[in-house]
């Protein structure tokens, strides 16, 4: 059994977005925390400032020479392989070993928890809910899968019993959670490394729903509408219909955001304005409204909080503008996410804006996902004017030798007239140096390391701008 007392917590892979959030919460609660990762990053540096002992590198020595007593309970994610030397040392030393989902489940059990699940939209929706509870004075503890400026990170410790958490389905650990409120944004086939079929995915979400006291779910998703059941189910939709609890009409999507009138069971609540773009974010906002109204928060407070919300890091995050080119970083790595992101971007391109062309750069994530969803990946870039595909980011998967980024590009050429395949990040940088022009909105898409290229591409454009200015002065 997990102990929340004198026994320390040691996280193998503490620099990950999910692991670091849990480590932060435990450290802020006054528990002794340590962890290791292969290299330092911004998250490990923040944890070190809290007094968390950080080991760089993963080796048996981290536990064999552990600085605290007693030996820790060791926390791993699904990314940690069974042959990891630190994991093997934990087994040899008899350390209690838990999955990161066990820590989150234990924290939920001690709280009035709101868990946000879904194939897409988890981070934005959970961040929106957390921001609403903050603005409503409910002082929640927050654990999300992205960094949010409002609480300067991916986690926050509040003083109330409320906990807002993002609940990951990728490895099936969603089945461990028993939240007070379970939010399900959508259900689609993903993570084929874990799930063999859509039916398995639906079954996992159904068990999560069964274990929640109340479920709030999107009726626009066929797999929710037709397959999900719960005796206390609140639904929301972008379509005005009597069968749902929350819906909208008079929707206006613009380059600045979205406006809509919100309905609650046939009664108009008022007008909602959002600064985040696209239909998918309006859906996310409806989930937030349903949660807020269930908690007794008035619509004016909800609408004000949603208007102020500016998004999470790597969710259509603007990285800057150089030489008349706008750079966007987005985590989208599933076809539905990519399509939603590009459709939102399309709202900002045209005669009424400075932006005239969308250039999408996509790094496929995992061989298993790419192979399973190949046709959908080929079809989801129609809202872009030009697309560049890199080779696949493995995320630790072995290369099966049956799928590559070139296959994605070949598939995309059946549906798109302007496609490049640049296998390496260096090749992408070279191609963009010749391709980009003032008026471009370039979006870097994927869950791998593609976004690390953005500063270099921006620096190239800075250099081009300086060179052009120098030539103009010389003339």
From Swiss-Prot:
Listed GO MF terms: ATP binding; UDP-N-acetylmuramate-L-alanine ligase activity
NCBIfam families according to UniProt: murC
Localization annotation: Cytoplasm
Record's GO cellular component terms: cytoplasm
Organism: Thermosynechococcus vestitus (strain NIES-2133 / IAM M-273 / BP-1)
Entries under HAMAP family matching the protein: MurC
A Pfam family assignment: Mur_ligase
Keywords tagged on the record: ATP-binding, Cell cycle, Cell division, Cell shape, Cell wall biogenesis/degradation, Cytoplasm, Ligase, Nucleotide-binding, Peptidoglycan synthesis
Superkingdom: Bacteria
Binding-site residues for ATP, renumbered to this chain: 118-124
Statement: the UniProt record of this protein carries the keyword Glycosyltransferase: no
Protein's name according to its UniProt entry: UDP-N-acetylmuramate--L-alanine ligase
Principal location: cytoplasm
Family annotation (SUPFAM superfamilies): MurCD N-terminal domain, MurD-like peptide ligases, catalytic domain, MurD-like peptide ligases, peptide-binding domain
Pathway this chain belongs to: Cell wall biogenesis; peptidoglycan biosynthesis
Purpose of the protein: Cell wall formation.
Source taxonomy: Bacteria, Bacillati, Cyanobacteriota, Cyanophyceae, Acaryochloridales
Catalytic activity reported: UDP-N-acetyl-alpha-D-muramate + L-alanine + ATP = UDP-N-acetyl-alpha-D-muramoyl-L-alanine + ADP + phosphate + H(+)
Gene Ontology terms describing biological process: cell division; cell wall organization; peptidoglycan biosynthetic process; regulation of cell shape
InterPro entries: Mur-like_cat_sf, Mur_ligase_C, Mur_ligase_C_dom_sf, Mur_ligase_cen, Mur_ligase_N, MurCDEF_pg_biosynth, UDP-N-AcMur_Ala_ligase_MurC
Cysteines paired by S-S bonds: none
Gene3D superfamilies (alphabetical): Mur ligase, C-terminal domain, Mur-like, catalytic domain, NAD(P)-binding Rossmann-like Domain
Family membership: Belongs to the MurCDEF family.
């Amino acid at each position: 059994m997990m102990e929340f007392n004198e026994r320390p917590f040691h996280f193998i892979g503490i620099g990950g977005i999910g692991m670091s959030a849990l480590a932060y919460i435990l450290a802020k609660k006054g528990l002794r925390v340590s962890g290791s990762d292969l290299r330092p990053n911004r998250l490990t540096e923040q944890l070190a400032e809290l007094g968390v002992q950080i080991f760089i590198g993963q080796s048996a020595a981290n536990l064999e020479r552990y600085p605290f007593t007693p030996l820790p309970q060791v926390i791993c994610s699904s990314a940690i392989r069974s042959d990891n030397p630190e994991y093997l040392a934990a087994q040899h030393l008899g350390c209690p070993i838990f999955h990161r989902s066990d820590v989150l489940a234990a924290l939920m059990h001690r709280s009035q928890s709101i868990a946000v699940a879904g194939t897409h939209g988890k981070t934005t929706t959970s961040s929106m809910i957390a921001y609403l509870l903050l603005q409503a004075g409910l002082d929640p503890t927050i654990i999300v899968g992205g960094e949010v400026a409002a609480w300067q990170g991916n986690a926050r410790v509040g003083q109330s019993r409320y906990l807002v958490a993002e609940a990951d389905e990728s490895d099936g650990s969603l089945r461990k959670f028993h939240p007070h409120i379970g939010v399900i944004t959508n259900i689609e086939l993903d993570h084929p490394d874990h799930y063999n079929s859509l039916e398995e995915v639906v079954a996992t979400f159904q068990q999560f729903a069964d274990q929640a006291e109340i479920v709030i779910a999107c009726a626009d998703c066929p797999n929710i509408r037709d397959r999900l059941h719960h005796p206390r189910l609140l639904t929301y939709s972008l379509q005005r219909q009597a069968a749902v609890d929350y819906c909208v009409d008079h929707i206006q999507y613009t380059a600045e955001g979205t406006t809509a009138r919100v309905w609650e069971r046939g009664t108009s609540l008022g007008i909602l304005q959002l600064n985040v773009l696209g239909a998918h974010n309006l859906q996310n906002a409806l989930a937030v409204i349903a949660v807020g109204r269930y908690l007794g928060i008035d619509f004016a407070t909800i609408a004000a909080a949603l208007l102020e919300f500016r998004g999470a890091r790597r969710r259509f995050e603007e990285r800057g503008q150089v030489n008349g080119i706008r750079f966007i970083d987005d985590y989208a790595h599933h076809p539905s996410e990519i399509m939603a992101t590009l459709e939102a971007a399309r709202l900002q391109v045209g005669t009424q804006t400075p932006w005239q062309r969308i250039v999408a750069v996509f790094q496929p994530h995992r061989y298993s996902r790419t192979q399973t969803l190949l046709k959908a990946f080929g079809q989801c870039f129609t809202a872009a004017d030009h697309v560049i595909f890199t080779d696949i980011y493995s995320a630790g998967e072995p290369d099966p030798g049956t799928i590559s980024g070139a296959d994605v590009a070949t598939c995309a050429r059946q549906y798109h007239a302007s496609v490049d395949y640049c296998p390496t990040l260096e090749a992408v940088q070279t191609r963009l140096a010749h391709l980009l022009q003032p008026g471009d909105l370039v979006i870097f898409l994927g869950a791998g390391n593609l976004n690390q290229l953005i500063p270099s591409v921006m620096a190239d454009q800075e250099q081009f701008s300086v060179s052009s200015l120098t030539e103009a002065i010389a003339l």
